[in-house]
From Swiss-Prot:
This is Protein LSM14 homolog B-B. GO terms for molecular function: mRNA binding. Residues 369-380 have a biased composition (Polar residues). Component of a ribonucleoprotein (RNP) complex, at least composed of cpeb1, lsm14b/rap55b, ddx6/Xp54, ybx2/frgy2, pat1/P100, eif4enif1/4E-T and eif4e1b. Different translationally-repressed mRNP complexes probably exist that contain either lsm14a/rap55a or lsm14b/rap55b depending on the developmental stage. Component of a ribonucleoprotein (RNP) complex, composed at least of elavl1/elrA and/or elavl2/elrB, igf2bp3/vg1RBP, ddx6/Xp54, ybx2/frgy2, lsm14b/rap55b and, in a subset of RNP complexes, stau1/staufen. The gene is lsm14b-b. A motif (TFG box) lies at residues 325-345. It comes from the Eukaryota. The lineage of its organism: Eukaryota, Metazoa, Chordata, Craniata, Vertebrata. It comes from Xenopus laevis. May be involved in the storage of translationally inactive mRNAs and protect them from degradation. Plays a role in control of mRNA translation. GO terms for biological process: regulation of translation. Residues 236-272 form the DFDF domain. Residues 160-241, 268-312, 352-380 are annotated as: Disordered. Residues 1-81 form the Sm domain. Residues 214-230 have a biased composition (Basic residues).
Length: 380
């Protein structure tokens, strides 16, 4: 080095074994780990020095870089530390810093590199010994991984100095209220943690949920009103509905019926005998007297075959007539109608009476009957 004593806060020009020159403010020298820390560092590249890997200069300014002592080739003091108005020699004072030099500091928002003090604070601590710096934690830096280099251990990259002022102004405008008044009271590498308020996204989410709740309540009220109107409606459930795939084919259906077989079947049921017709008084096959049960079997004649009228057995007589011989029973007529016209449709109940008296949508017939009954009893 050009001088025998290192100056904390002075501007240092450092050349590494890779022939790359760095300029920055001397921050601290760690004798135990053999490292040198520079603040506000800028790389000027190899600058025509002989090397296998030439590097161009860079415009980025790093907050600090810790260099390994074994990889440093040369160190030169460019500028001595700036003079600061030190206090009187008082053994009670351990460390001090000027607030006027850091006037821009209150507007700076929270930064992950807040542990690195400013240049003015470095100048104020130029007379501190290495023991005081170690006891106050000045030699500790947050471990931030950067690109590998044989002489650079840690580095913090920031933007160019021209863009930093604009970014600070923009961040100061958009910074939270609780963070605008934060300022650093000394070069401490590990300051007290800040009580940062939680992000406003969950709060906005809860506000949106509260704004959405009234429409849900309205929808619930609408449902209750609809239920009160139609709660007495009879539910019509269709059981075993018959599905027709196509139109009915009358020709194929008529082809299945044989007229002669049907006539023969009806004659057998009615006990008609074409060959030997019975007498008028002995006609046993009177369909009017003979009735069929639900199974279609003819019941026995309550009167005798030769008894025309018996008062004790039946009110009806057994006198044959042309109308009685042609008349069929209800079971046969129902079967004949089913074969001719098909299955009749089901009667759906409850269609004309909707809602009853509570819903107010019922038919007018029950109300008319109610008014007539009240008029008859004399009630109003």
């Amino acid at each position: 080095m050009s001088s025998g004593t290192p100056y904390i806060g002075s501007k240092i020009s450092l050349i590494s074994k890779a022939q790359i020159r760095y300029e920055g403010i001397l921050y601290t020298i760690d004798t135990e780990n053999s490292t040198v820390a520079l603040a506000k560092v800028r790389s000027f590249g190899t600058e025509d020095r002989p090397t296998d890997r030439p590097a161009p200069p860079r415009e980025e300014v790093y907050e600090y870089i810790i260099f390994r002592g074994s990889d440093i080739k040369d160190i030169t003091v460019c500028e001595p530390p700036k003079a600061s108005h030190a206090l009187s020699q008082d053994p009670a004072i351990v460390q001090s810093s000027l607030g006027s030099a850091a006037s821009y500091q209150p507007s700076v928002p929270y930064s992950p590199f807040r542990g690195m003090p400013t240049y003015s604070q470095l100048a104020a601590t130029s007379l501190l010994s290495q023991q005081y710096a170690a006891s106050l934690g000045l030699a500790g830096f947050p471990s931030i991984p950067v690109r590998k280099s044989p002489m650079v251990e840690q580095a913090v990259q920031t933007g160019p100095l021209e863009n930093q002022a604009q970014k600070k102004v923009q961040q100061a405008k958009g910074a939270p209220v609780g963070l605008r008044g934060v300022r650093q009271s000394g070069p401490q590498s590990q300051p007290a943690p800040l009580n940062v308020p939680p992000p406003a996204a969950p709060v906005l989410g809860t506000v949106n949920d509260e704004n959405r709740r009234p429409p849900r309540r309205r929808s619930g009220n609408r449902r209750t009103r609809n239920r009160s109107r139609g709660q007495n409606r009879p539910t019509t459930v269709k059981e075993n509905a018959i599905k027709f795939e196509g139109d009915f084919d009358f020709e194929s259906a008529n082809a299945q019926f044989n007229r002669e077989e049907l006539d023969k079947e009806f004659k057998d049921k009615l006990n008609f005998k074409d060959d030997k017709p019975e007498k008028a008084g002995e006609e046993k096959t009177d369909s009017g007297v003979e009735t069929q049960n639900s199974d279609g079997n003819p019941e026995e004649d309550p009167l005798g075959p030769n008894t025309y009228y018996d008062r004790s057995k039946s009110f009806f007589d057994n006198i044959s007539s042309e109308m009685k011989s042609r008349r069929t029973t209800w079971a046969e007529e129902r079967k004949l109608n089913t074969e001719t016209f098909g299955v009749s449709g089901r009667f759906l109940r409850g269609r004309s009476f909707r809602g009853g008296f509570r819903g107010g949508r019922g038919s007018a017939a029950p109300r008319r009957n109610q008014t007539t009954q009240r008029a008859g009893t004399g009630r109003v």
